[in-house]
């Protein structure tokens, strides 16, 4: 089992490098954060170790840290008129293996349908859905591996497309030093039913991240490098960083910054030589979480640009 996981990870790295310059336009809702904890830390985090099923969406290897029979429900408002929801439930097989079932859904709302003369003839809706199964396994004392197999469908009016893909993840965690490092390949796959004859790929994303909690201090810091299969923009814009203030085992507050989100959302202010660009807070994120026995509530807020933000709520309950 250990050799299989390591071989798969190495194969993914090679494939990601070979496809580094390919466009990523299909099923990009899979890039959205599902975990409010990860959202608060900048939107991408693959390395924090918590008893939290929603982190499985970020890294399938993190399922090994989740308690048996935990139900997780998530809801997020995203941009204008778009809402997304997700759910997860897991089982612990033994001291090494766990599995989970995951689901994601996004509704983009109603849109106008017009003819070639721009005359409105009605309305149509658009939505996307993903269903997945995850398996994680302890490959060694401190090393976990995980795989998620996912089916994805997109519906626009009376048309639809379908795809299949996998996520692969590794996590090394040393509980004595509270240091965690992970590598993840997300969304390797492609369409088997396209809207037209142009079959596309899923939004492949190679990520590496690390988290560290300091001894005798209530802080944990995280840094994640994302989209490492594309190098046509500056290195700093691959970085997502975050910090947590862990007030107790039951409560934390967190903040993060996503450099690429801030860069992409900059808008010009002024004209001529006096013109400047400002992100108006885009890239910033905040959140908090609390746990009461078997119940956990987490909230994450992120700024996308001057007129758009998201609010993500997670609820988990151990049965």
What are these regions (language model features)?
Residues 21-319:
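Subset of outer-membrane beta-barrel
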Residues 15-20:
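Sec/Tat signal peptide C-region and signal peptidase I cleavage site
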Residues 4-14:
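Sec-dependent N-terminal signal peptides
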């Amino acid at each position: 089992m250990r050799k299989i996981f390591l071989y798969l990870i190495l194969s993914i790295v090679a494939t990601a490098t070979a496809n580094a310059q390919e466009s990523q336009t299909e099923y990009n809702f899979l890039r959205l954060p599902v975990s409010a904890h990860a959202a608060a830390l900048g939107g991408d985090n693959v390395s924090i170790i918590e008893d939290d099923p929603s982190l499985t969406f970020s890294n399938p290897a993190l399922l090994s840290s989740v308690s048996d029979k935990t139900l997780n429900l998530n809801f997020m408002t995203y941009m204008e008129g778009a809402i997304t929801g997700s759910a997860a439930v897991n089982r612990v097989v033994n001291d090494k293996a766990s599995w989970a079932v995951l689901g994601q859904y996004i509704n983009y709302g109603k849109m106008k349908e017009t003819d070639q003369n721009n005359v409105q003839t009605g309305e149509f809706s658009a939505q996307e859905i993903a269903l997945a199964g995850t398996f994680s396994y302890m490959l060694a004392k401190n090393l976990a591996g995980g795989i998620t197999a996912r089916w994805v469908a997109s519906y626009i009016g009376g048309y639809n497309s379908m795809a299949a893909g996998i996520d692969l993840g590794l996590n090394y965690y040393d509980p004595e030093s509270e240091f965690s490092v992970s590598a993840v390949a997300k969304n390797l796959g492609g369409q088997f039913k396209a809207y037209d004859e142009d079959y596309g790929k899923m939004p492949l994303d190679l990520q590496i991240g690390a988290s560290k909690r300091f001894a005798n201090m209530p802080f944990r810091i995280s840094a994640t490098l994302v989209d490492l299969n594309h190098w046509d923009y500056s290195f700093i814009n691959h970085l997502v960083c975050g910090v947590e203030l862990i007030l107790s085992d039951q409560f934390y507050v967190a903040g993060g910054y996503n450099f690429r989100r801030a860069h992409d959302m900059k808008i010009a202010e002024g004209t001529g030589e006096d013109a400047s660009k400002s992100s108006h807070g885009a890239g910033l994120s905040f959140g908090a979480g609390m746990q009461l026995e078997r119940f956990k509530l987490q909230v994450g807020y992120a700024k996308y640009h001057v007129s758009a933000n998201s609010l993500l709520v997670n609820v988990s309950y151990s049965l």
